[in-house]
Amino acid sequence: MNPRLRSAAFIALFAFAGAVMAAKPDKTVVPPVPAGQAQIVFLRHSVVSAKANTLIYETTSGQPKVLGIIPNNRKLVVSVPPGDHVFMIGNLPTCDFLQASVLADKRYYAVVVSRWPDGFTLRPVRGRESAQQGEYSYGHAEYPDLLKYTTLAGRAPDSYVQSELKNAETHYPGKWQQWQSKTPEQKAMLTLKAEDSEG
C-alpha cells in the first residue's frame, strides 16, 4: 500500500475509534436533578455479600413500591417530590429502613451497607460539617471510591421484581412496626436530612 494511503487509513481509523469512544456514555455519571424534584443516589460498593442482589423500595404511602435493583458496584438514581419519604432495602424478611426529608432541586446520597450473611442497611451521606463519628460524609475517605467505582444500575427482571414484591407486601407491616421501636437517636442516624444535600 502506498505510504501516504497507509497513513491516511491509520488517521481515519483512530478518528473513528475516538468518535466511538466519545459517543459512549459514561455510566458512572449521575444525570442532572429534574427541575422541581429531589434526587437521591443510592451507592453500593462492598466486598461483603458482593454477589447478592437486593431491591430498594419506597414505603412512604404504607405500601411497598419497587424503585429498582442495586447489585454490587452500582448506583441507583431516584427522583422524588420534595418532602418526607421512607425507603426500604432488603430481601424480605430481612430489611431495613431510611427516612428522608428532601428539598426540591437538590441531590442527596445514601450508601448501601452490606451485613453478613444477607442483610443490607442504608446510611445517609452527611454534609462535611454535620457528620458524626462513624457516619458517611462528603469528606469521608471512602466517598470518592463510591462514586468512581459504581455505574448506573439497570432494570430488574420483572419476574424477580414481582416475586420480591409479594414477599415485601407480606413482611413489611411487621418489619416497619419493629423499626418504630428504635430510639430517637437510632432513628436520627437512619434519617437523610434536608441539609445533607450535595454542595
Regions found by a protein language model. Give the residues of each.
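Bacterial N-terminal signal peptides that target proteins for export
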Residues: 1-10
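Short loop/turn and low-complexity linker motifs enriched in small/turn-promoting residues
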Residues: 22-199
